[in-house]
Amino acid sequence: MTRADKAARLPATFMATKTIIKPKQSPAAVGPYNHAVRVGDLLFCAGQIPIDPKDGNLIAGDIKAQTGRVLQNVKAILDDQGLTFANVVKSTVFLTDLANFAGMNEIYAQYFTENFPARSTIQVAGLPKGAGVEIEVVAHF
């Protein structure tokens, strides 16, 4: 099979142009990455931590406050592209302590209210800037 034959069999998503998304309402990135990249009808959002977009600082507070700020940061990216949490098809939650799962889940359920995305939750040794939670999502246009 030639390369052209293989390309013809790929879904359009994999042949689409990569577009960098830089939402105006998002906090500055804390490293060499973009907050979101669109490829075809998919939007890949980088992991968001509880940074206040106004001052670039990690917010103070418990896991519920941190999760709320994280999801507000995710919402800013989705809003920028005309999407909502209903468009999210996959999320990955990173927690520094799985004992915080219930608190995170309580706030998460306020944003994802129906047609839930697939989700993974992973405990990690640490997150940037000392955050307790980070969430990344993939959304569909």
Locate each region found by the language model.
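Short, low-complexity intrinsically disordered segments enriched in A/P/G/S/L with frequent Arg
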Residues: 8-10
